[in-house]
Amino acid sequence: MLTVAMTLFTAYNATAQKKTTPNRQAKPAAVNADSVEVRKLTDAAKKGNSEAQNTLGTYYYSGKKVKQNYDVALKWFSMAAKQKHVKAIANMGLCYQLGRGIKQDSVMAVKLYKESIKAGNAELVKQREENVAKNKSAFDINLLADIYYNGCGNTVKKNNELALKYLKMAAANNSIEAAVRAATIYDQAKMYAEALPYYQKAAGKGDAVSEYKCGDYLCNGKGTKVNKAQAAAYLDKAAKKNVPNAMMMLGDLLYKGDGIQQDYAKAMGLYKLAAAKNNPVAVWNVGIMYKNGQGVKQNYVIALQWLADAASKGMKANFQKLLNEPNVEIKNGWKNTDFYSFVHAMTFMESTTPDYATAVKELTILEKKNIAVASTLLGLCYADKSWKKANEKKMMAYYEKAAKADDPYANFLLAKLYFEGSNAVKADKNKVVVCYEKASEGGYAPAKCELGNLYFTGKIVNKDISKAIAYYNDALLNGYLSKEAADNLASCYQQGLGGVKKDAETAKEIAKRGKVGNAWTALLRGITFEQKN
């Protein structure tokens, strides 16, 4: 609790009182003069004179010439402050700081002090600096650290040197925010050795960004020796607090086994979490891991889904470069690989004028290598009735073959067929759910969306909004949310359905995430292939 009495600000030009000899006869005259002055002040204050209002407030605050009354003091300060009286605003801040006439509120006090300073009250800054020099007031240390760190209008310019002076004092008083700010100033100046102790101090108190920065420093040898194991420990804490950069950095360490044990599955989990926060590199990394079968079962369709999304977020050049770069020696290009052939075949299928005959030739080669998704795509070729060789029996045979090999895309397509029914297959509600579930378990996000839609609407299955939300969230984590799924999930947050709290902002953000169709169509129509060797 603050014990330092702060100076009240007043500037009203009231009639000065002559000093009198303290005798019995002088007292009534002095009291009478005070009463006259207070009455004049009150009349002026009631007429809206902000100087009079502020001065009257100081009288009631201090008990000068009137009986002390904090409530009345605050009333007059407030009236003057509404007229932008700079010193009255500061005096209101004092009331909030000390809890005089109102409940103590340090945040509001700082807000009012900064408003007063910004409006030109340099005297307040000087007063607080003097107070710190005399009494080491924690409140004033934090206030001064804040205004010098951020600047405060034209009255106080941003000053890192003075900011550091007060931030260090505040950090010594266990202010996490001050420690982070001091570290940030040093970090921006690339004075890493000076920054690290402050980041460590804040990290020790659980500050997520500081935990990430400690991990970054230890990982990259900034201001300290490289220690990947210690870095990973810090990064893990920050990642669990949803810091995307920490997720990425820890994911990279786990992916490479750099200083810690390699773990593709954990790396994948972290990349997906970062991808859900729209980190394009994380989106790309997930796609690469599906392409390579690292930490997950290899699946070219899911890989392409992720890579196409990354391409739409600015990484198309990466895709194009690797597509035509050879996979030899130290180069990790895709040219003449199975994935290259898969993408090549897909371009013929996704063209504005599909060439299924050419696609089938390429896919048949892949199918002979037991690449399940090739069977699925062959089925898709025969499913298109615009092709003269369309054949529903062949379509079903290929889908079922791929589904037996646990290809999620095949199960997804089968679920759609069982839902609608066709000449090749009868509608079967039970098989719809089973196939969607298999596709979902295989990581195919559109299947998760469809399951969510079923539980949201109560079609085929018993309506269960909570279960629908779980599928939608899982779909988001797996890189895709259909327009219908996004609208349904948004409505849950808009109305507070399925156990989620009403949140209009979250609803709005989710609605924006909805996608129509496949992201890969635009990518496949915009890439070029060099001639095969």
Residue ranges of each PLM-predicted region?
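Sec-dependent signal peptide cleavage junction
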Residues: 12-38, 43, 106, 334, ...
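Short helix-capping/linker turns of helical repeat alpha-solenoids
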Residues: 46-49, 62-64, 82-85, 98-100, ...
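Hydrophobic face of amphipathic alpha-helices that form TPR/SEL1-like repeat modules
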Residues: 55-62, 91-98, 127, 131, ...
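Terminal, low-structured helical/coil segments at or just beyond the last alpha-helical repeat
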Residues: 22-24, 127, 131, 320-340, ...
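TPR/TPR-like (Sel1-like) alpha-helical repeat modules
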Residues: 104-121, 298-315, 473-475, 487, ...
